[in-house]
Amino acid sequence: MTTDTIVAQATAPGRGGVGIIRISGDKATDVAMAVLGHLPKPRYADYCDFKNASGQVIDQGIALFFKGPNSFTGEDVLELQGHGGQIVLDMLIKRVLEVEGIRIAKPGEFSEQAFMNDKLDLTQAEAIADLIDATSEQAAKSALQSLQGEFSKEVHELVDQVTHLRLYVEAAIDFPDEEVDFLSDGKIANALYKIIDKLSAVQASAKQGSIIREGMKVVIAGRPNAGKSSLLNALAGKESAIVTEIAGTTRDVLREHIHLDGMPLHIIDTAGLRDTTDTVEQIGIERAWNEINSADRVLFMVDGTTTDAVDPHDIWPDFINRLPANLGVTVVRNKADLTGENLAMTEEKGYSVYRISAKTGLGVEELKQHLKSLMGYKSNLEGGFIARRRHLEALDVAASHLQLGKEQLEIYLAGELLAEELRMAQLALSEITGRFTSDDLLGKIFSSFCIGK
């Protein structure tokens, strides 16, 4: 861990009402004496002059001193809050750098110091960046939940439960009770099942939190002239795609990024899927399948005037059979204004079926509500946390090891192998909060922060 004293502008570059310079480290007191002529009383606002080396006043403003470890970084911290002109702030930083042992902070280094000094865990540190980068009110609320430790609490509880069970298994192996077969008495199995259930619940919440942060990717797919581009326009609320009666008008991927009541949604319109000898259209269809394979959800667009079927396996079995196994599909029967179909949503063999008219807007609002529900709109209003892709990956790894441990217990009664799977699950979960995390990962995470944070 670095012992350098660092300085950076904590407010956005440019012109503003207030500009803040932040200093953290052992030399913060030296900076105070050099620039202010005195050390402010800790945690009190001190209005004073900010002076250069010749004693001339650079600016006037508020100085705040926080004595470590009772500060954001856990070190001595000095904040100089002056006027928000960039020239003035640059002069002030230049003056601070004249004090021996001070350097410019790297992106995210203040938060990194807070993490290294146990003021924050890694999920809380990441939540700071997510709160700053939030693109919707819901994302900001969820990031704040993570910053306040909601996600960390869930992960710590899982780590504690896995660790406790692992220690119990290892102790039972080392000190066996000859009268009781601890692997088959049900206690370990019950404890393991409870952990797996809790992890599954956390995974579901984290997936919703990831959607809040990164958005849900929804691909509109189907045969040519089914109304895919019209639906894109209806969902986006503007004419993003060209719509004609000519089949195959859309030949490339079109993207729109919208928010549904604060929930980010990435809508992808694709070329109509069919056999064709047209080289350009073939490229568009190949790109369409690439988008489908990486989607969170597919809206299977069906021209309602061509078939009465509602089961996608009856409508186009080859298309459904080619989709990734775990990809969710919503069937959208279009042109209800022509077919006269009831707009009510129905469930058909596990698939949600919506009847709409993308041209007139009939049923589109109900489809939007469906997409909001898929993104966990209600649960996130009630207070969900935000999550990143690396969190989901770590949870998946932990779940995989717990399932392998379950097999070792149920099939082979292999205590040593169960203990090893529990250890691996513990390590995967601990990576989320940063207890066991490589320096490379830490560098990647904090380098994405803004300077001064």
Curated annotation (Swiss-Prot):
GTP binds at residues 225-230, 244-250, 269-272, 334-337. Its EC number is 3.6.-.-. One of its GO terms (cellular component) is cytosol. Binds 1 potassium ion per subunit. (6S)-5-formyl-5,6,7,8-tetrahydrofolate binds at residues 22, 79, 119, 453. Gene3D superfamilies: P-loop containing nucleotide triphosphate hydrolases, Probable tRNA modification gtpase trme, domain 1, tRNA modification GTPase MnmE domain 2. Residues 215-376 form the TrmE-type G domain. It is found in: Cytoplasm. Its cofactor is K(+). InterPro entries: G_TrmE, GTP-bd, GTP-bd_TrmE_N, GTPase_MnmE, MnmE_dom2, MnmE_helical, P-loop_NTPase, Small_GTP-bd. It is an enzyme of class 3 (hydrolase). GO terms for biological process: tRNA methylation; tRNA wobble uridine modification. The keyword Secreted does not apply. K(+) binds at residues 225, 244, 246, 249. Mg(2+) binds at residues 229, 250. One of its GO terms (molecular function) is GTPase activity. Keywords: Cytoplasm, GTP-binding, Hydrolase, Magnesium, Metal-binding, Nucleotide-binding, Potassium, tRNA processing. Belongs to the TRAFAC class TrmE-Era-EngA-EngB-Septin-like GTPase superfamily. TrmE GTPase family. Homodimer. Heterotetramer of two MnmE and two MnmG subunits. HAMAP family: GTPase_MnmE. Exhibits a very high intrinsic GTPase hydrolysis rate. Involved in the addition of a carboxymethylaminomethyl (cmnm) group at the wobble position (U34) of certain tRNAs, forming tRNA-cmnm(5)s(2)U34. This is tRNA modification GTPase MnmE. It comes from Shewanella sp. (strain ANA-3). The lineage of its organism: Bacteria, Pseudomonadati, Pseudomonadota, Gammaproteobacteria, Alteromonadales.
